């Protein structure tokens, strides 16, 4: 039974598991083969079953298997090895073989039923010529048989070339196969993709079927030496096939040269020292009528039915490389699904784990506005650690949220960092590096101080014009910039508002100034805005000159004023300090020349210089919308020269300078450092305090403005996402939060910002002002539609008036419009409005106290307490607390109050009375009644 194929081995060759054994047995029944779990089958049966399972070729099996009980028949190869009669078996095999040679010549081959020792059966299950059921005995062919074999070669040459072409095309590319094998190759390809990589490797390896020539062992040659010596030397089968093989090789070379095709890969020989393998993978039939082989020859030709031992490693590597390349292409393909993206994100997560090994920097430099992830990158910290630290401190942020100054300071303390904040906009600006000779420039002087201390009047006297009278209420509400000439030298003055609402405007004035003049009224002394102005000047690191105004008034105490300044750290020169205190009178003009000379001396000491060549860099002091001009801005140049026709951008605004007008109303063409002018040609009103940058053309200006707009939009979204735990708690607790939606319109950008900040300061935990829209310019129909869509909304206008059409639309929409010319009135009216929405403060007033001496239970009425008034007056219907042993038991109202049997409105101290509470009867002797009334008071902001 050595030639039989075990069913389990057959399953292993197919790459199937024991679970699929039942399906294989059912498929064997379809071709007439009865199998069981431990059954064995002949190689012929195994081959037909393999073709049926893999290729779908159904060949019925004739049941000619030997009966195991008939031991004398010697039907199995094992029994044939015993010494029995040989001649009858050979003749029987011939008689069975001849009829099949006439019908199917190309599907016949010798069967491995021989009596020789050392016979090896090899099976690849892909042989193109299936073996016959009963193989003939092997004998040595004659010379005529050799000639017939050569003639047979010519007859099958056409079919051999077609099959050879099919084999070659399958080796290069499975998709270029002929139509006869195309469907089979596609089905096999789909099956290979569905199975495991091991099955894929086994099925992709090229297999070959051939004849194995096996030599006798030395002991066999010795036992049969007498038989072989008596025979004459004849040509062996190996020689026959070697001649045939040479002819094929010569014809193959001619065919390949003509078609310029690639040479097929050589098949590695089996590792057997005593055997030779001849490749017949092209289904060539060499079975002739006289192909009878002698058993007694030294060499035997057997049909190869075993799988090839040596695997083609190069093909295996190529298959694996193709799979890897295809997977790599799919991962990098942008049109694929998200699988590749997830793969890359895993790599990023592995990379992030290495962040724990980073060396944290001790000193870092960051911009004023920095995101969480940017801070982590600058400090070389793990992003998760930064977010976790903020979370533990009660602030929930994402990596794209911006950090405020407090958060940056907290992170610096937590991670032991030293942080320097840089005030740059390099990411959004295209400022060129200015190279050239620096020239002397005029000083920029900012006049600051408390409201109504005479700042604008001082500047008015210097300019000899009545500027203060043009402001509403005599209060400066805009930044004014002017140029004044003194002793042949120019000085630029910036007048800032003194009202508390204009803190940001004073801050902008201090940032662009060289010298700060603090105006203090000699009869009023240092006030709140005076201290604030000094703080702005200190932060800007600019020298300070004190102007003691209103010296013309009586009862002026200069020593008191100097003492107040000295307490703040500003010691006068005559007191041994370094600060100049100059007495002036803006009304009479006394001391103004001395002030100007002091300013020029300070400017000479500072040696103020700037580069005049190149692109301009300026600061926007104020922006507004003027009728007939559109958006305009007051700017002061810091470096370079701004000319008419130059392209520029400032924050989200951009444009080209159309006109420039100085403080005298004259048109100018060029604006040099420290000069101020009003420019037109802007796309929108720029924010006050923004930096104006001159660029090469309009395209660059538009691009930079769009970048800045995107940045500001992200920052605004970041503010809406950040929330603290305390804010969440307040939002949950204050379900009845009241707010007033407003639309604010003003004539200038600076005034608009001042109003917004002042109104937002009025917000508290109960009521709030919600600014749904704000802008510079007149009231439009768009503003009305915004207010109409919001309940209880109002429009606030500052220094503007609605047109007739807008008024009609407002009546139609039932929208309230309120306009103001003084900021005081606007803020106070909104304060009153908020106070009206706020719930009043409730206070309690103690009115009386009574002690329970006896209780009376009256059916269907309740419990009446007999009391004595010990303090105050007890009134009917008043609120009362029932106190027992110092603990409040009940709070309610007095339902009935009687004096003996008569009803009483009130009972005074020292008198007895009867008290019955509303819906409460659990009164005991010794309890105390305490009466009180609630007083509602208005809240204050």
UniProtKB/Swiss-Prot annotation:
Gene3D superfamilies: P-loop containing nucleotide triphosphate hydrolases, Translation factors, Translation initiation factor IF- 2, domain 3
Region (G4): 549-552
Biased composition (Basic and acidic residues): 147-163, 180-204
Region called G2, residue ranges: 474-478
GO molecular function terms attached to this record: GTP binding; GTPase activity; translation initiation factor activity
Low complexity composition bias: residue spans: 164-179
One of the record's GO cellular component terms: cytosol
Origin: domain of life: Bacteria
Cell location: Cytoplasm
Family matches, as Pfam families: EF-G_D2 (PF22042), GTP_EFTU (PF00009), GTP_EFTU_D2 (PF03144), IF-2 (PF11987), IF2_N (PF04760)
Cross-referenced PROSITE patterns: G_TR_2 (PS51722), IF2 (PS01176)
Region (G3): 495-498
KW GTP-binding (keyword) present: yes
Keywords: Cytoplasm, GTP-binding, Initiation factor, Nucleotide-binding, Protein biosynthesis
Positions annotated to bind GTP: 449-456, 495-499, 549-552
Role description: One of the essential components for the initiation of protein synthesis. Protects formylmethionyl-tRNA from spontaneous hydrolysis and promotes its binding to the 30S ribosomal subunits. Also involved in the hydrolysis of GTP during the formation of the 70S ribosomal complex.
Family stated for the protein in its record: Belongs to the TRAFAC class translation factor GTPase superfamily. Classic translation factor GTPase family. IF-2 subfamily.
Protein's UniProt name: Translation initiation factor IF-2
Native species: Helicobacter acinonychis (strain Sheeba)
The gene coding this protein: infB
């Amino acid at each position: 039974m050595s030639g039989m194929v075990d069913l389990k081995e057959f399953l292993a060759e197919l790459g199937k598991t024991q679970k699929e054994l039942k399906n294989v047995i059912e498929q064997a029944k379809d071709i007439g083969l009865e199998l069981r779990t431990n059954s064995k089958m002949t190689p012929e049966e195994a081959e037909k079953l393999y073709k049926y399972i893999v290729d779908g070729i159904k060949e019925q099996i004739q049941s000619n298997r030997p009966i195991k009980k008939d031991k004398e028949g010697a039907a199995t190869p094992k029994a044939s090895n015993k010494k029995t009669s040989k001649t009858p078996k050979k003749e029987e095999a011939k008689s069975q073989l001849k009829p099949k040679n006439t019908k199917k010549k190309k599907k016949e081959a010798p069967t491995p039923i021989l009596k020789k020792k050392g016979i090896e059966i090899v099976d690849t299950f892909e042989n193109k010529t299936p073996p016959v059921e009963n193989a003939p005995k092997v004998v040595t062919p004659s010379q005529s048989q050799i000639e017939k074999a050569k003639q047979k070669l010519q007859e099958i040459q056409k079919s051999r070339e077609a099959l050879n072409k099919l084999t070659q095309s399958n080796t290069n590319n499975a998709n270029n196969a002929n139509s006869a094998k195309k469907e089979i190759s596609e089905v096999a390809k789909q099956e290979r993709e569905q199975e495991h990589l091991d099955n894929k490797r086994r099925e992709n390896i090229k297999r070959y079927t051939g004849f194995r020539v096996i030599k006798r062992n030395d002991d066999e040659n010795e036992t049969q030496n007498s038989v072989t010596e008596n025979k004459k030397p004849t040509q062996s089968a190996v020689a026959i096939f070697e001649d045939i093989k040479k002819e094929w090789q010569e014809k193959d070379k001619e065919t390949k040269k003509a078609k310029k095709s690639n040479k097929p890969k050589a098949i590695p020989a089996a590792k057997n020292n005593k055997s030779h393998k001849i490749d017949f993978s092209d289904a060539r039939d060499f079975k002739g009528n006289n192909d009878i082989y002698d058993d007694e020859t030294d060499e035997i030709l057997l049909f190869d039915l075993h799988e090839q031992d040596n695997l083609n490693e190069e093909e295996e590597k190529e298959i694996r490389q193709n799979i890897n390349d295809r997977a790599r292409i799919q991962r990098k393909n942008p049109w694929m699904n998200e699988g590749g993206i997830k793969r890359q994100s895993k790599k990023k997560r592995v990379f992030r784990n290495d962040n724990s090994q980073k060396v944290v920097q001790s000193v870092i430099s960051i911009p004023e506005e920095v995101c969480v992830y940017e801070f982590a990158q600058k400090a070389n910290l793990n992003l998760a650690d930064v977010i976790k630290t903020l979370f533990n401190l009660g602030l929930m942020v994402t990596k794209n949220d911006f950090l405020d100054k407090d958060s940056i300071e907290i992170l610096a303390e937590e991670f032991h960092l030293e942080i320097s904040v840089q005030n740059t906009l390099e990411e959004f600006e295209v400022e060129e590096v200015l190279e050239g000779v620096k020239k002397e420039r005029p000083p920029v002087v900012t006049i600051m101080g408390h409201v109504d201390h005479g700042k604008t009047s001082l500047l008015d006297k210097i300019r000899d014009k009545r500027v203060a009278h043009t402001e509403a209420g005599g209060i400066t509400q805009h930044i004014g910039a002017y140029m004044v000439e003194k002793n042949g030298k120019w000085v630029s003055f910036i007048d800032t508002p003194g009202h508390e609402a204009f803190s940001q405007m004073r801050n902008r004035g201090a940032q662009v100034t060289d010298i700060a003049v603090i105006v203090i009224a000699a009869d009023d002394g240092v006030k709140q805005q005076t201290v604030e102005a000094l703080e702005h000047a200190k932060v800007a690191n600019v020298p300070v000159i004190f102007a003691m105004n209103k010296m013309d008034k009586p009862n002026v105490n200069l020593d008191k004023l100097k003492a107040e300044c000295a307490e703040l750290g500003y010691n006068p020169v005559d007191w041994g300090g370094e600060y100049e205190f100059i007495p002036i009178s803006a009304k009479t003009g006394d001391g103004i020349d001395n002030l100007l000379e002091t300013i020029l001396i300070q400017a000479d000491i500072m040696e103020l210089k700037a580069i005049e060549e190149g692109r301009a860099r300026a600061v926007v002091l104020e922006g507004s919308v003027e009728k007939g001009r559109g958006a305009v801005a007051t700017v002061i140049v810091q470096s370079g020269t701004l000319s008419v026709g130059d392209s520029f951008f400032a924050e989200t605004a951009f444009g080209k300078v159309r006109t420039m007008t100085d403080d005298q109303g004259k048109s100018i063409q060029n604006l040099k450092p420290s000069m101020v002018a009003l420019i037109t040609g802007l796309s929108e009103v720029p924010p006050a305090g923004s930096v104006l940058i001159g660029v090469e053309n309009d395209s660059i200006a538009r691009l930079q403005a769009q970048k800045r707009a995107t940045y500001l939009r992200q920052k605004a979204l970041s503010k809406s996402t950040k929330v603290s735990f305390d804010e969440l708690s307040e939002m949950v607790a204050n379900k009845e939060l009241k707010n007033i939606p407003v639309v604010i319109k003003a004539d200038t950008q600076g005034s608009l910002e001042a109003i917004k900040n002042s109104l937002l300061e009025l917000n508290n935990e109960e009521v709030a002002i919600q600014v749904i829209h704000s802008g510079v310019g007149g009231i439009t129909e768009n503003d009305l539609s915004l207010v109409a869509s919001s309940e209880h909304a109002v429009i606030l206008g500052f220094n503007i008036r609605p047109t007739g059409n807008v008024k009609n639309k407002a009546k139609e929409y039932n929208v309230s419009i309120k306009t103001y010319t003084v900021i005081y009135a606007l803020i106070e009216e909104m304060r009153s409005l908020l106070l009206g929405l706020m719930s009043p403060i409730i206070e309690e007033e103690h009115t009386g106290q009574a002690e329970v001496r006896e209780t009376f239970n009256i059916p269907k009425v309740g419990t009446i307490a007999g009391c004595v008034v010990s303090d105050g007056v007890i009134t009917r219907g008043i609120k009362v607390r029932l106190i027992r042993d110092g603990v409040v038991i009940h709070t309610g109202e007095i339902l009935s109050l009687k004096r003996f049997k008569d009803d009483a409105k009130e009972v005074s101290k020292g008198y007895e009375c009867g008290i019955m509470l509303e819906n409460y009867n659990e009164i005991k002797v010794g309890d105390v009644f305490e009466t009180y009334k609630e007083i509602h008071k208005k809240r204050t902001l």
